[in-house]
């Protein structure tokens, strides 16, 4: 009798382990645009010497150069990570000879995955667009918007509404997408409440705007949006939405019940580097850090999810030159207002996280994710 019970228990344990291994894993790719080690370190010291990245199991380094330039832009680097090919700066979803290449998001869709994109830039910006667009000029937003309508992405969050419905060709892509089953919302509350499996959350007409406070730093107010004050209630405006929309999207993807791929971009870490603005940089990293915490909480509970956190490049050539641990204050200096060729870190947690240790080209991020999808 006891022997039979033990055998039955062993069978159940073996079955559960096998089921988990045979189930396709979820993929969460987080890109801190412009986020080098100094951006991370500055945020960490400003946050009582702590960051959610300390919970990750493995750390690697990625070489960010583009096909013909040591200093990449977000289009070339985004294409390398999304599609596994080096290309020229400003190019999305094409190899260096102009051939269309398939992204990891599209490959995941072919294998039955649900998909999502979230960005604190406009959703057609280079990093998110690298996962669905094939075009030779990253700033051709109106054509990229047309490609977005055909992407099949389940959920997307970001700015850029005007490229869909305020167009010279008079097309209303929002109406076209609505006719094809999409729902659109303009605030986090409606996004959280929606039951649609095809949902767009526009956070601004063009680029999202924020009103942030970094820890121990002063408030900074940014340029006003290009829409009237009476329209502000329809948009997120200056509120942070990355962590809240990520949590809501993970819940939505989980409820669908299929494996999923999601790319989450903290876009404005890069913008702060271009501005050489330490306060802005720290506040943007801290928002990204809060979002990492949300993602880790999901992955730890799910136990069948790979989380990869990396950057497309470093911006600003930032260096911490002085500071105090006692009051979490720091002082950065910048050597550039553009991108640099520094390697960037790759943090990994969860399913087959060990694949991402070491030093490698950024194209290997695609290859490693592909090996997980094709397991």
Give the label of every model feature segment.
Residues 133, 140-141, 166-234, 238-241, ...:
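Glycine-rich ThDP/TPP pyrophosphate-binding loop and its adjacent helix/strand module
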Residues 20-167, 171-193, 197, 289, ...:
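N-terminal catalytic scaffold of extracellular/periplasmic and nuclease hydrolases
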Residues 308-311:
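Active-site neighborhood of phospho(di)ester-bond hydrolases with catalytic His/Asp-centered motifs
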Residues 126-132, 207, 212-217, 222-225, ...:
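Active-site His/acidic residue clusters
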Residues 254-256, 300-303, 337-341:
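A structural signal for short secondary-structure junctions
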Residues 2-8:
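Sec-dependent signal peptide recognition
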Residues 75-77, 198-204, 256-268, 342:
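Short coil-to-beta-strand
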Residues 9-18:
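Hydrophobic h-region of N-terminal signal peptides that target proteins for export
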């Amino acid at each position: 009798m006891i022997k039979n019970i033990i055998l039955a228990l062993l069978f159940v344990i073996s079955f559960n382990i096998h089921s988990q291994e045979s189930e396709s894993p979820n993929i969460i790719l987080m890109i801190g645009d412009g986020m080098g080690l100094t951006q991370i370190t500055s945020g960490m010291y400003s946050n009582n010497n702590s960051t959610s990245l300390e919970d990750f199991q493995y750390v690697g380094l990625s070489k960010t150069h583009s096909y013909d330039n040591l200093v990449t832009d977000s289009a070339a680097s985004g294409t390398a990570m999304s599609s596994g090919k080096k290309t020229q700066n400003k190019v999305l979803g094409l190899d260096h000879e102009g051939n269309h290449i398939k992204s990891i998001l599209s490959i995941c869709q072919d294998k039955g995955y649900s998909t999502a994109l979230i960005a604190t830039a406009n959703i057609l910006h280079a990093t998110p667009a690298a996962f669905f667009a094939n075009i030779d000029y990253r700033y051709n937003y109106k054509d990229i918007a047309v490609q977005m309508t055909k992407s099949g992405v389940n959920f997307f969050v970001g700015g850029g509404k005007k490229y869909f419905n305020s167009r010279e060709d008079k097309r209303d892509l929002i109406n076209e997408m609505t006719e094809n089953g999409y729902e659109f919302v303009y605030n986090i509350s409606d996004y959280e409440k929606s039951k649609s499996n095809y949902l767009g959350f526009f956070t601004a007409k063009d680029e999202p705007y924020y009103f942030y406070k970094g820890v121990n730093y002063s408030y900074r107010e940014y340029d006003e949006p290009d829409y009237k004050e009476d329209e502000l209630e329809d948009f997120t405006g200056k509120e942070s939405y990355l962590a809240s929309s990520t949590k809501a999207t993970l819940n939505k993807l989980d409820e669908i019940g299929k494996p999923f791929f999601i790319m989450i971009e903290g876009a404005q870490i890069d913008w702060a580097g271009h501005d050489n603005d330490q306060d802005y940089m720290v506040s943007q990293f801290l928002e990204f850090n809060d979002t990492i915490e949300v993602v880790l909480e999901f992955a730890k509970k799910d136990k069948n999810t790979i989380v990869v956190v990396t950057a497309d490049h470093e911006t600003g050539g930032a260096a911490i030159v002085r500071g105090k641990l006692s009051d979490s204050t720091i002082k950065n200096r910048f050597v550039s207002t553009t991108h640099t060729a520094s390697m960037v870190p790759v943090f990994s947690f969860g399913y087959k996280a060990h694949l991402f240790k070491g030093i490698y080209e950024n194209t290997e991020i695609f290859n490693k994710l592909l090996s997980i999808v094709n397991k």
